[in-house]
From Swiss-Prot:
Keyword terms of this UniProt record: ATP-binding, Chaperone, Cytoplasm, Isomerase, Nucleotide-binding
Positions bound to ATP: T29, L30, G31, P32, D86, G87, T88, T89, T90, G414, D495
EC number: 5.6.1.7
Coarse class of the protein's main subcellular location: cytoplasm
Gene: groEL2
Described function: Together with its co-chaperonin GroES, plays an essential role in assisting protein folding. The GroEL-GroES system forms a nano-cage that allows encapsulation of the non-native substrate proteins and provides a physical environment optimized to promote and accelerate protein folding.
Name by which UniProt lists this protein: Chaperonin GroEL 2
Compartments (UniProt record): Cytoplasm
Organism encoding this protein: Gloeobacter violaceus (strain ATCC 29082 / PCC 7421)
Length: 553
């Protein structure tokens, strides 16, 4: 396919138009008085969202040059979401401000590479400042405040997440499910999470969030590497007849076996997912046994004379729900195996007492936490499907923000921390060369952008509010919900330091890339021929039967 090649200022301005198109759509959601965005869906009702990364992922521009800019800024939101789980809108607003100011300087003759170096050095110093000023999260009240702010000032969600963390611990597993009722409620159940995800992305059931949800699945546990489909066919046929999904946890699954499972999943013959067993060596066998106890199944191992071809339904584990991402599996078990789980916990306690090795004791402690901690499930209720999806996204954001706050502490929220960091820029500039100082000035101007946007969305003049806050003490900021200047931490308006840090780092990274771009190469759009309608395709004919499970052989 032919390519379009665009140079110099034309290339950078095209990127900027794309950046602005996406950022202008996202930034209206920032702050407690931010508005919503409605996303049209090809199937089903439109989706109403207030989440930066969800909006960013939906935007595709017609002009390929501008679309490249939009994709770059989408990367800012995605990366911030991956690292911190929240702060995607803040990152987008920062990146837009940096690119706008930076391109103005490049057009005026500043050296882009010097600007880039200045920005990088300044951000590195500011990240250290954020870490130094972060206050650790030590009580439930602070956790509730962070969750409330991140969920769009929903106090019910804030209290629920604080309660969930209290019940399963700060390292515990908290999942979010859709409820059948109108009420949002918290449920703590037996369950565990381990650090292995699906072996193939073809297993996902939700392509937007790239996760797999299995309701009431059977679970096949084996310490064997599976590569031949013949071994699995008997158990697959039994599960298919039962009409329930299947989770396979094995040492590995590859080759013909993996290909056949993927094909049958895509055809809708059997909803199945394969994940690798956690741990290594003897520890892997012990963890498989833990999962077996939790789910009421057996580990299929030739060490004890069990073979895959002889597996019966009774040997399979069962769970209420399983959620799998690319790197994590969460099993929410029923309550049927409580006695067996308690017996297993007592056994692990005994092993911990008997061992002399600190390493072994640490690993046993990890297993114990996985088994004993349980899983807190927040069941999201709402009056309509559209509200339910929006509420679920808000709760997931709040949950991520809370975990980030526990990890790296909190700083004053509402864009206050970023704005007050501008006071540190002069000291940083003292160690920079000429054009590098301009890079530091770019960062200083961009740091105002989130607070200005929060104020604008609240219906007041952003530049006036920013100027007033700059003159106040470090903790004092603008509470857009009440329209007052307050001590942000005392008022419960806090941001996780990790979210603020990630937003700044990712925004500066992408902005530096845009400023140092000299050539843009994209596919040339194909011109549609006038009057060329689609030819008559004729009838499609029937699809034919898919055959039974024997088609896998």
């Amino acid at each position: 396919m032919a390519k379009m090649i665009v140079f110099d200022e034309t290339a950078r301005r095209a990127l900027e138009r794309g950046v602005n198109a996406l950022a202008d759509a996202v930034r209206v959601t920032l702050g407690p008085k931010g508005r919503n965005v409605v996303l049209e869906k090809k199937f089903g009702a439109p989706q109403i969202v207030n989440d930066g990364v969800t909006i960013a992922k939906e935007i595709e521009l017609e002009d390929p040059l501008e679309n490249t800019g939009a994709q770059l800024i989408r990367e800012v939101a995605s990366k911030t979401n991956d690292v911190a789980g929240d702060g995607t809108t803040t990152a987008t607003v920062l990146a837009q401000a940096l690119i706008r100011e930076g391109l103005r300087n490049v057009a005026a003759g500043a050296n882009p590479m010097s600007l880039k170096r200045g920005m990088e050095k300044t951000v590195a110093k500011l990240v250290q400042e954020i870490a130094a000023m972060a206050k650790p999260v030590e009580d439930n009240k602070t956790i509730a405040e962070v969750a409330t702010i991140s969920s769009g000032n929903d106090e019910e969600i804030g209290q629920m997440i604080a309660e969930a963390m209290d019940k399963v611990g700060k390292e515990g597993v908290i999942t979010v499910e859709e409820s059948k009722s109108l009420v949002t409620e918290l449920d703590v159940v037996e369950g565990m999470q381990f650090d292995k995800g699906y072996v193939s992305p073809y297993f996902v059931t939700d392509t937007e969030r790239m996760i797999t949800d299995l309701d009431e699945p059977f679970i096949l546990l084996t310490d064997k590497k599976i590569s031949i489909i013949q071994d699995l066919i008997p158990v697959l046929e039994k599960v298919a007849r039962a009409g329930r999904p299947l989770l396979i946890i094995s040492e590995d699954l590859e080759g013909e076996a993996l290909a056949t499972l993927v094909v049958n999943k895509l055809r809708g013959v059997l909803n199945c997912v394969a994940v690798k067993a956690p741990g290594f060596g003897d520890r892997r066998k012990a963890m498989l046994q833990d999962i077996a106890v939790l789910t009421g199944g057996d580990v299929i191992s030739e060490d004890i004379g069990l073979k895959l071809e002889n597996v019966t339904i009774d040997m399979l584990g069962k769970a209420r729900k399983v959620t799998i991402t690319k790197d994590k599996t969460t099993i929410v078990a029923g309550t049927d195996n409580k006695a067996a789980v308690e017996k297993r916990i007592a056994q692990i306690h005994k092993q911990m007492e008997d061992t002399d090795s600190d390493f072994d004791r640490e690993k046993l402690q990890e297993r114990l936490a996985k088994l004993a901690g349980g899983v807190a499930v927040i069941k999201v209720g709402a009056a309509t499907e559209t509200e339910l999806k929006d509420r679920k996204l808000r709760i997931e954001d709040a949950l991520n923000a809370t975990k980030a706050a526990v990890e790296e502490g909190i700083v004053p929220g509402g864009g206050t921390t970023l704005l007050h960091l501008t006071k540190k820029i002069d000291a940083i500039k003292a160690g920079l060369a000429d054009d590098e100082k301009t890079g530091a000035d770019l960062i200083a101007r961009a740091l105002e952008a989130p607070l200005r946007q929060i104020a604008d969305n609240a219906g007041v003049e952003g530049s006036v509010i920013a100027q007033k806050v700059r003159e106040l003490d470090f903790n004092i900021g603008y509470d857009a919900m009440k329209g007052e200047f307050v001590d942000m931490l005392a008022a419960g308006v806090a941001d996780p330091a990790k979210v603020v840090r990630s937003a700044l780092q990712n925004a500066a990274s992408i902005a530096a890339m845009v400023l140092t771009t000299e050539v843009l190469i994209v596919d040339k759009p194909e011109k549609k021929k006038a009057g060329a309608g689609a030819p008559d395709m004729g009838g499609m004919g029937g699809m034919g039967g898919m055959g039974g499970m024997g088609g896998m052989m």
